[in-house]
Curated annotation (Swiss-Prot):
This is Large ribosomal subunit protein bL21. This protein binds to 23S rRNA in the presence of protein L20. The keyword ATP-binding does not apply. It comes from the Bacteria. PANTHER family: 50S RIBOSOMAL PROTEIN L21, LARGE RIBOSOMAL SUBUNIT PROTEIN BL21M. HAMAP family: Ribosomal_bL21. Keywords: Ribonucleoprotein, Ribosomal protein, RNA-binding, rRNA-binding. SUPFAM superfamilies: L21p-like. The gene is rplU. One of its GO terms (molecular function) is rRNA binding. The keyword Translocase does not apply. InterPro entries: bL21-like, bL21-like_sf, Ribosomal_bL21, Ribosomal_bL21_CS. Part of the 50S ribosomal subunit. Contacts protein L20. Belongs to the bacterial ribosomal protein bL21 family.
Amino acid sequence: MYAVIKSGGKQHRVNVDELLKVELLKAEKGETIKIEDVLMVVDGDDYKIGQPVVEGASVEAEVVEHGRGKKIRIVKHKRRKHYHKEQGHRQWYTLLKIKAINV
């Protein structure tokens, strides 16, 4: 059984006991959250597709940790003008462990 959920403007396919990195959520470490933006649920040959979400479906997940991703480098450069600008960015994330998929 798996589900497709929406979190942070992105869609994620999730299974039970799977770890998932999503955009930063306002939840404490160890807290259990309920995600109700379930777009699709598949159980063997049986599937439910929401329009836009599946009614009554939810995914329960536990917050494992909050952290920051790897640094990316943003570089701007203009040739022949001695202009060179570099900037770094690290995106915050929340690591979730999927506990249950409820239909």
